[in-house]
C-alpha cells in the first residue's frame, strides 16, 4: 500500500497554526476523538489493523530504510557515539522484526473488558471491575525508530490513541514508519489520529505535550536519565518513569564462580546500550583474592573497561557502553545498602548458592525486578512471557516492571441494580 498521500501523514502541521502549543493541543484533541472510537473496537478489528500495519511496514521497507539511512548519516556527521547509532539504525532484518512485533501484539489477549473482580452486595447490587483504555497516551523517546511502531501496536491493541514525540535524530525514520501505519489505518477504516507524530525539531513540543492537562491522560518518557528526569519534573499530566537502569550484579561469597562469570558477561556485553545491561559489579570482600581477578580479566578480555576505583558519578552511572563500575563490599547487607543507595529501581541480580542470602536479597533490594542466579538482561516483556512492552517502569504507581498491554489500561466499576436507592 502506498504512503505517498500527504493526507495520510501523521506529522503535525508545522506551518499552520503558527503557535506550537496550539499545534500540540490540537493534535491531542484529535487524539481524544480517535480514542473514543478505539475504546469500543472489537479485538478482531484491532487485530486486523495490526496485521495490516505489519503488511504496510514491509511494503514500504524501501522508503523506511532510505529515511533511516539519511538519519544515520546525519547522526554520524554530528559525532553521535556508535552505541547510539546502533539504536538508531535499521536494516531489512530489523524492519522484519518490527513488523513481526505487530503480529505478536495481535496474537496477545485483548485486555480491554477483562473483569478483574466482582461481587453481589447484600442489597442486590452487582459490581464488577473491568479494564478500560487509558485514553490518550503520550510517548517521549530518543533515537529508536522501533519504539514508534511498538508504541503504536500496544496503544492500538489496548484501545488508546498515541501522541508520539520522538528524537529529531530519528525524525525521517519515524515519519516514514508513521506514514506506513496511518496508511494501514485508512485501509481498515479506522481513525488516522490513532497515531500522530509531534514536531521533533523544537523541544518546546515536549513541554506542550507534558503540560496538556485534560487532553493527555498519561505521558511515558523512554530514554536516558536526563530525558526522563526532565519530563517527570516538568509534567502537569501523569507520567510513568521508564528505563533508567543502573543495574548491579552482586557476586556473593558463596557464588559458583563459573556461573557468576557467565551471568556477568551476558548482563554486561550482550547489549550494553540497553537499560537492563549491568552497569556495576559488586564483589564480596571474601572473594578479593580469588574470584575478583578472574571476573575482571573476563570483562577486560571481552572489551569492557572496568572502573576499579569508581567516582561517585560512576557509581550512579548508566554507562550504556562497554564500561562497568567495580566495588568490593563487606558482605550481603553492604551489597543491599549499596544497591538501595545507587540503584535506579530497575533490575538487580545476586549470584549465590546460599538460599537464605538469596531470600534476604530479594526481600530487601528495592527494584522492579530482582534476579537470583540469572542475568539482568531477562527483564523484558517478551522474555517474561508478556509479549511486547512499551517500557520498563521503575516507579511504584501505576505500573512497575515491564509494561505490556494490561499496564496501558485503567479500570472502571460497573454497577447493575434493580431500582436500589441508598437509605438516608
From Swiss-Prot:
Q: Which organism is it from?
A: Mycolicibacterium smegmatis (strain ATCC 700084 / mc(2)155)
State the UniProt keywords alphabetically: Amino-acid biosynthesis, Cytoplasm, NADP, Oxidoreductase, Proline biosynthesis
The function of this protein is: Catalyzes the NADPH-dependent reduction of L-glutamate 5-phosphate into L-glutamate 5-semialdehyde and phosphate. The product spontaneously undergoes cyclization to form 1-pyrroline-5-carboxylate.
Q: Note the InterPro entries from the entry.
A: Ald_DH/histidinol_DH, Ald_DH_C, Ald_DH_N, Aldehyde_DH_dom, G-glutamylP_reductase_CS, Glu-5-SA_DH, GPR_dom
HAMAP family per record: ProA
The Swiss-Prot or TrEMBL record describes its family as follows: Belongs to the gamma-glutamyl phosphate reductase family.
| GO MF annotation terms | glutamate-5-semialdehyde dehydrogenase activity; NADP binding
Q: Please tell me one Gene Ontology term that the record gives under cellular component.
A: cytoplasm
Where, per UniProt, does this protein localize? Cytoplasm
Database matches in PANTHER family: DELTA-1-PYRROLINE-5-CARBOXYLATE SYNTHASE, GLUTAMATE SEMIALDEHYDE DEHYDROGENASE
Quote the EC number.
1.2.1.41
Please give the Pfam families that the UniProt record associates with this protein: Aldedh (PF00171)
| Keyword Oxidoreductase appears in the UniProt entry | yes
Q: In which pathway does it act?
A: Amino-acid biosynthesis; L-proline biosynthesis; L-glutamate 5-semialdehyde from L-glutamate: step 2/2
Q: Return the protein name.
A: Gamma-glutamyl phosphate reductase
Q: Main localisation, per the record?
A: cytoplasm
Annotated region Disordered: the residues are 1-27
Q: Which GO terms describe its biological process?
A: L-proline biosynthetic process
Catalytic reactions of this protein = L-glutamate 5-semialdehyde + phosphate + NADP(+) = L-glutamyl 5-phosphate + NADPH + H(+)
Amino acid at each position: 500500500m502506498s504512503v505517498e498521500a500527504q493526507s495520510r501523514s501523521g506529522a503535525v502541521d508545522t506551518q499552520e497554526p503558527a503557535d506550537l502549543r496550539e499545534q500540540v493541543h490540537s493534535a491531542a484533541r484529535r487524539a481524544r476523538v480517535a480514542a473514543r472510537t478505539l475504546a469500543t473496537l472489537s479485538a478482531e478489528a484491532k487485530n486486523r489493523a495490526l496485521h495490516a500495519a505489519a503488511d504496510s511496514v514491509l511494503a514500504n521497507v524501501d522508503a523506511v530504510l532510505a529515511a533511516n539511512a539519511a538519519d544515520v548519516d546525519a547522526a554520524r556527521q554530528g559525532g553521535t557515539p556508535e552505541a547510539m547509532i546502533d539504536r538508531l539504525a535499521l536494516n531489512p532484518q530489523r524492519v522484519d522484526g518490527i513488523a513481526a512485533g505487530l503480529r505478536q501484539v495481535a496474537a496477545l489477549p485483548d485486555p480491554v473488558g477483562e473483569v478483574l473482580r466482582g461481587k453481589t452486595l447484600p442489597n442486590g447490587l452487582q459490581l464488577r471491575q473491568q479494564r478500560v483504555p487509558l485514553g490518550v497516551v503520550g510517548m517521549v523517546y530518543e533515537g529508536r525508530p522501533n519504539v514508534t511502531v511498538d508504541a503504536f501496536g500496544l496503544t492500538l491493541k489496548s484501545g488508546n490513541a498515541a501522541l508520539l514525540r520522538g528524537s529529531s535524530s530519528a525524525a525521517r525514520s519515524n515519519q516514514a514508519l508513521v506514514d506506513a501505519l496511518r496508511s494501514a489505518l485508512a485501509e481498515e477504516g479506522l481513525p488516522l489520529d490513532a497515531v500522530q507524530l509531534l514536531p521533533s525539531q523544537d523541544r518546546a513540543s515536549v513541554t506542550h505535550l507534558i503540560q496538556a492537562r485534560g487532553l493527555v491522560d498519561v505521558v511515558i518518557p523512554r530514554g536516558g536519565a536526563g530525558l526522563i528526569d526532565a519530563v517527570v519534573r516538568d509534567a502537569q499530566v501523569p507520567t510513568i518513569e521508564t528505563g533508567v537502569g543502573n543495574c548491579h550484579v552482586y557476586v556473593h561469597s558463596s557464588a559458583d564462580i563459573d556461573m557468576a562469570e557467565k551471568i556477568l558477561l551476558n548482563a554486561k556485553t550482550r547489549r550494553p546500550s540497553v537499560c537492563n545491561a549491568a552497569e556495576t559489579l559488586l564483589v564480596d570482600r571474601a572473594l578479593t583474592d580469588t574470584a575478583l581477578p578472574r571476573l575482571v580479566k573476563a570483562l577486560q578480555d571481552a572489551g569492557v573497561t572496568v572502573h576499579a576505583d569508581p567516582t561517585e558519578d560512576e557509581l550512579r552511572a548508566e554507562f550504556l557502553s562497554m564500561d562497568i563500575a567495580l566495588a568490593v563490599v563487606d558482605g550481603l547487607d553492604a551489597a543491599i545498602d549499596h544497591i538501595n543507595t545507587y540503584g535506579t529501581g530497575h533490575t538487580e541480580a545476586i549470584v549465590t548458592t546460599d538460599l537464605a542470602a538469596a531470600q534476604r536479597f530479594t526481600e530487601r533490594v528495592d527494584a522492579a525486578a530482582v534476579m537470583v542466579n540469572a542475568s539482568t538482561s531477562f527483564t523484558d516483556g517478551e522474555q517474561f512471557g508478556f509479549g511486547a512492552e512499551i517500557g520498563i517502569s521503575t516507579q511504584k504507581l501505576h505500573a512497575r516492571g515491564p509494561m505490556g498491554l494490561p499496564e496501558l489500561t485503567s479500570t472502571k466499576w460497573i454497577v447493575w441494580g434493580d431500582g436500589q436507592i441508598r437509605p438516608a
